[in-house]
Amino acid sequence: MSRSKRDNNFYSVEIADSTFTVLKRYQNLKPIGSGAQGIVCAAYDAILERNVAIKKLSRPFQNQTHAKRAYRELVLMKCVNHKNIIGLLNVFTPQKSLEEFQDVYIVMELMDANLCQVIQMELDHERMSYLLYQMLCGIKHLHSAGIIHRDLKPSNIVVKSDCTLKILDFGLARTAGTSFMMTPYVVTRYYRAPEVILGMGYKENVDLWSVGCIMGEMVCLKILFPGRDYIDQWNKVIEQLGTPCPEFMKKLQPTVRTYVENRPKYAGYSFEKLFPDVLFPADSEHNKLKASQARDLLSKMLVIDASKRISVDEALQHPYINVWYDPSEAEAPPPKIPDKQLDEREHTIEEWKELIYKEVMDLEERTKNGVIRGQPSPLGAAVINGSQHPVSSPSVNDMSSMSTDPTLASD
């Protein structure tokens, strides 16, 4: 594309102290969220004739960590296609060459609210169970591609008014290790598993801890472990769940183990005390969903020792969840990710910049006619339509009572 022709395809608008330079097809931009990764706007896509969300990545080439995360997000969004993972509609840059390249814009489906807003609604069992089921389906799909999230939280899970849920991002790269230190929070880490905050090894069920924290928040209407830093968070975990057994301590690094073993010992509380019946909605007559089932699921997810924690497959088969089970959702074919060493890659900022530029150019070429070509199904088209679920009451899959603005929050 020639320089003058490319210039004519874009226009600029000031959004939340940032300049958005976007394709002319995107109109009526309105800010709806911001965070560590960038600013998000709602917009109308005149080609697709639908509302979308546009995220401008925040300083993607500021350092190697930012650049690696931007590359990882682009590659994974291009490959992953599941109804419970946010759909990629377009990627573009207003710059005309690699030398000028500095801005990346990602266009995604626009949702109605994030889970932070939904949690405050005092959900009934059907809604809570259905939201958790979709969360688990999305997580299982990521796991099938070798993607372990490690950073699930309500702000990065979004819903439609019909109760459709989607996971927004792909979490922490595996090489982004965290040490057990009194590091100030840059993003919310209340939902990260003990093995992450203690700098241990981990496996797929690291994400089930996060789901347990989110479910607990749905029940209690408050954050379970709101630590000021990792040490304070660990203290809050053991105060409620109890000090782990000596076998767990043996798995810790020596310096971490010394600290953990020197903490006061706590017996913890029973899950009946942590989550009493009074906190739960009335038992569901339609699907026979009960507080006792929900509490049992919580007790299997909120387990400090990951070797004793439930897996995503086991969670999907739990009585509180499996009323929704549909193989087309829970057993969808795994995405094919061409770069098998995605999380292990290490490059200079300039090398990352070139890799990201190539991805953006490839995606621009594939979206010339409005939508991404080469996807298993047209992302963004009929994204809400799923299989029939075993519930007929419109109140179960209808959250139209939500009085929230459209959102697609970043962390």
UniProtKB/Swiss-Prot annotation:
<feature type="short sequence motif" description="TXY">
    <location>
        <begin position="183"/>
        <end position="185"/>
    </location>
</feature>
<dbReference type="GO" id="GO:0042826">
    <property type="term" value="F:histone deacetylase binding"/>
</dbReference>
<dbReference type="GO" id="GO:0051247">
    <property type="term" value="P:positive regulation of protein metabolic process"/>
</dbReference>
<dbReference type="GO" id="GO:1904646">
    <property type="term" value="P:cellular response to amyloid-beta"/>
</dbReference>
<dbReference type="GO" id="GO:0097009">
    <property type="term" value="P:energy homeostasis"/>
</dbReference>
<feature type="active site" description="Proton acceptor">
    <location>
        <position position="151"/>
    </location>
</feature>
<feature type="region of interest" description="Disordered">
    <location>
        <begin position="368"/>
        <end position="411"/>
    </location>
</feature>
<dbReference type="GO" id="GO:0042542">
    <property type="term" value="P:response to hydrogen peroxide"/>
</dbReference>
<dbReference type="GO" id="GO:0120283">
    <property type="term" value="F:protein serine/threonine kinase binding"/>
</dbReference>
<dbReference type="GO" id="GO:0031175">
    <property type="term" value="P:neuron projection development"/>
</dbReference>
<dbReference type="GO" id="GO:0071347">
    <property type="term" value="P:cellular response to interleukin-1"/>
</dbReference>
<dbReference type="GO" id="GO:0071803">
    <property type="term" value="P:positive regulation of podosome assembly"/>
</dbReference>
<keyword id="KW-0963">Cytoplasm</keyword>
<protein>
    <recommendedName>
        <fullName>Mitogen-activated protein kinase 8</fullName>
        <ecNumber>2.7.11.24</ecNumber>
    </recommendedName>
</protein>
<dbReference type="GO" id="GO:0048813">
    <property type="term" value="P:dendrite morphogenesis"/>
</dbReference>
<dbReference type="GO" id="GO:0031398">
    <property type="term" value="P:positive regulation of protein ubiquitination"/>
</dbReference>
<dbReference type="GO" id="GO:0032880">
    <property type="term" value="P:regulation of protein localization"/>
</dbReference>
<dbReference type="GO" id="GO:0070301">
    <property type="term" value="P:cellular response to hydrogen peroxide"/>
</dbReference>
<dbReference type="GO" id="GO:0051403">
    <property type="term" value="P:stress-activated MAPK cascade"/>
</dbReference>
<dbReference type="GO" id="GO:0009411">
    <property type="term" value="P:response to UV"/>
</dbReference>
<dbReference type="GO" id="GO:0034349">
    <property type="term" value="P:glial cell apoptotic process"/>
</dbReference>
<feature type="modified residue" description="Phosphoserine">
    <location>
        <position position="377"/>
    </location>
</feature>
<dbReference type="InterPro" id="IPR008271">
    <property type="entry name" value="Ser/Thr_kinase_AS"/>
</dbReference>
<dbReference type="GO" id="GO:0030424">
    <property type="term" value="C:axon"/>
</dbReference>
<keyword id="KW-0547">Nucleotide-binding</keyword>
<dbReference type="GO" id="GO:0071260">
    <property type="term" value="P:cellular response to mechanical stimulus"/>
</dbReference>
<dbReference type="GO" id="GO:0061833">
    <property type="term" value="P:protein localization to tricellular tight junction"/>
</dbReference>
<dbReference type="GO" id="GO:0097050">
    <property type="term" value="P:type B pancreatic cell apoptotic process"/>
</dbReference>
<dbReference type="GO" id="GO:0071732">
    <property type="term" value="P:cellular response to nitric oxide"/>
</dbReference>
<feature type="domain" description="Protein kinase">
    <location>
        <begin position="26"/>
        <end position="321"/>
    </location>
</feature>
<dbReference type="GO" id="GO:0090650">
    <property type="term" value="P:cellular response to oxygen-glucose deprivation"/>
</dbReference>
<dbReference type="GO" id="GO:0005737">
    <property type="term" value="C:cytoplasm"/>
</dbReference>
<dbReference type="GO" id="GO:0007229">
    <property type="term" value="P:integrin-mediated signaling pathway"/>
</dbReference>
<keyword id="KW-0539">Nucleus</keyword>
<dbReference type="GO" id="GO:0048666">
    <property type="term" value="P:neuron development"/>
</dbReference>
<dbReference type="GO" id="GO:0007254">
    <property type="term" value="P:JNK cascade"/>
</dbReference>
<dbReference type="GO" id="GO:0034614">
    <property type="term" value="P:cellular response to reactive oxygen species"/>
</dbReference>
<dbReference type="GO" id="GO:0071222">
    <property type="term" value="P:cellular response to lipopolysaccharide"/>
</dbReference>
<dbReference type="GO" id="GO:0002052">
    <property type="term" value="P:positive regulation of neuroblast proliferation"/>
</dbReference>
<dbReference type="GO" id="GO:0006979">
    <property type="term" value="P:response to oxidative stress"/>
</dbReference>
<dbReference type="GO" id="GO:0048545">
    <property type="term" value="P:response to steroid hormone"/>
</dbReference>
<dbReference type="GO" id="GO:0004712">
    <property type="term" value="F:protein serine/threonine/tyrosine kinase activity"/>
</dbReference>
